[in-house]
């Protein structure tokens, strides 16, 4: 049950892979592995090619081969320590490997090179939340929303933090803003309705469920929400 919500890393991968990443992902792992094998063969003849190493790292990430991706990105940043794509990728990969301090350093170095960069600020805020640097995380996401007040992604990220922390009324507001800014994303509505049901705001929750049905979500996929509403007094 997912709408076409923006996903920063996926968009970056698509750019690096020349628009072929999504199509190959739909074909399955075999196509991805074939592309990775080809990239590896070509790299043998051009070991200092940063572009090829970034593309190979992108395939590794698509296949969730985090250690292989990190090795490639280390080589990219050895060749060019200020490579923006390399820092962004490696921060993501380090986070997947639970190397949180290294990921944080990559994001911070990225922000030195591109101050105010949306992706880096968002990544750093979410990393801080995951690593229990809660004050830094919330300060970071608040700052991001001040800089990018029209970003549905930023509001949804803050809503997710607030939901995890039990700040439910604030989370309802932020997911509502995300829905207002991006009316195509089912995930925002799903989180919003979940919060409304928890808070006992039944009328608004039913409005959200009707909205999801209008967006093409089948009634059967919403049964759990309807059941929770029926149990609410």
Locate each region found by the language model:
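Canonical positions in the second alpha-helix
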Residues: 41-42, 75-76, 109-110, 143-144, ...
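N-terminal leader/linker segments that initiate helical-solenoid repeat arrays
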Residues: 21-71
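Helix-start (N-cap) detector for alpha-helical repeat units in TPR-like alpha-solenoids
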Residues: 50-51, 84-85, 118-119, 152-153, ...
């Amino acid at each position: 049950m997912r709408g076409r919500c923006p996903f920063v890393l996926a968009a970056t991968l698509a750019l690096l892979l020349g628009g072929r990443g999504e199509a190959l992902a739909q074909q399955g792992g075999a196509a991805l592995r074939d592309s990775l094998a080809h990239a590896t063969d070509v790299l043998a003849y051009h070991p200092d090619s940063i572009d090829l190493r970034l593309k190979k790292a992108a395939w590794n990430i698509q296949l969730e081969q985090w250690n292989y991706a990190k090795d490639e990105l280390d080589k990219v940043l050895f060749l060019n320590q200020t490579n923006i794509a390399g820092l962004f990728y490696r921060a993501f990969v380090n986070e997947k490997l639970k190397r949180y301090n290294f990921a944080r350093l990559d994001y911070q170095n990225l922000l030195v090179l591109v101050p105010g960069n949306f992706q880096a600020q968002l990544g750093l805020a979410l990393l801080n939340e995951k690593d229990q640097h809660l004050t830094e995380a919330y300060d970071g996401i608040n700052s991001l929303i001040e800089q990018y007040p029209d970003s549905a992604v930023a509001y949804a990220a803050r809503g997710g933090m607030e939901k995890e922390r039990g700040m439910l009324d604030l989370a309802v507001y932020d997911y509502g803003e995300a829905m207002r800014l991006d009316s195509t994303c089912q995930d925002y509505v799903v989180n919003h309705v979940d919060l409304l049901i928890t808070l006992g705001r039944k009328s608004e929750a039913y409005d959200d469920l009707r909205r999801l049905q209008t967006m093409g979500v089948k009634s059967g996929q919403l049964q759990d929400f309807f059941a929770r509403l029926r149990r609410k007094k």
